Amino acid sequence: QGRMTIIPPEKTDDGKITIGGLDANIWMTKYGNVYTDCKAEDFMGKLGFAWGDLVTVKFLDKTLTLPVVPTYSYVDSGKPAIIVEKDADGKPTGYVSMAINMGNFAETYELAKKHTNEDKTWYWTAWEGVTYPVEVTFKMAEKGGYMAEYIMHDLQRTNDRADYPNLSDAEFGNFRNIATTGMGKDVLYRGSSPINPELGRNTYVDAALKQAGVNVIMNLANSQEEAEAYEGFADTYYSGHKVIYLNLGVDFSAPEFQKGLAEGLRFFAANKGTYYVHCTEGKDRAGFVSALLECLMGATYDEVVADYMVTYYNYYGVEPGTDKYNAIANSNIIKTLQNAFGVEDLSKADLQKGAKDYMKAIGLTDAEITDLMVNLGYVAPVEPATPSKPATGDAGIVVYLGLGVMALAGGV
């Protein structure tokens, strides 16, 4: 995420590396990734760094020791890194950036503040006291010091359908029904973008949406303007249905993410239908939101982890039971939900309570949570009349149903 082609101003030969400004999608991405004017090939060539090295980075009054990796997913959730992307041949490409996995580097390290407009477009302003360009220095801390973790996180995928002969078209698009405990039958689906052609999967996903009868969609990745600009958008099944466009980043603790997610959950609560949650890959933002909804509806710990990890099989062939599988789960969805729910051991937590408390904390009311659960297939238990109590007909049933629905917002 946050990948782009940047063309910074022509660099002077003074040997300095800088973050040149605040321009959106040149120096700063919507996720808070920060680009420098150092070419990746120079970083690896002239400066002598390599993937798997630990490097000391200095800027402003900050000193960090960061691993050099090809993408944010090579570090645990919440951890920063130096990003040097790989091209199709495995060579360094583009410009050196810094990012936090599921976080916002620019704001965390007080470089810039993000602002979001009502139409979900965004822009950056300098942090108080910061002027641009900002000089950055890189110095080797430990050659190969991150290599063990690097190998564990090393994941390879392609966007070529022919490379995934064992997957159905829907699986290739990372599209699937969520069928965890408590979830209604064929009510909620998740996956990659049905409109963004970047991954070569959008047409497969759009076809899967149609087959599933999806008609209420939460788009975590785009603004409406951005979505409608994709080639062929108007001809998609997707475009003819109810969609909320949230254009969210990946810092799940950020107020703007939580505000946007609350809007998305209210949208689901207010619109009955067959639901779809997606971002770009259907991996991080959609992975978190899907897990949250699974927990809300009564899923077990094992179910939540297993559903999240299906994505890593669909894209990367990561098999359950392997060290890589466990490392990815522990450093991503388990850690993310522990932070969201404020618990130390997710496997021992009351996941439904955690989800409800989280939703209340980001602004949902008990009534909205109840509506959301009912729309996702929650059926309130109807208690049988006791022998000592005369049958009360419809009125009695109404009492029991009422108690069941009232309990939704509590500890059901």
Regions found by a protein language model. Name each.
Residues 277-279:
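The Walker A (P-loop) glycine that initiates the GxxxxGKT/S ATP-binding motif of P-loop NTPases
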Residues 2-120, 127-133:
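Long, compositionally biased stretches
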Residues 15-34, 183, 258-259, 263-267, ...:
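Extracellular/luminal Pro/Thr/Ser-rich low-complexity repeat and linker "mucin-like" segments
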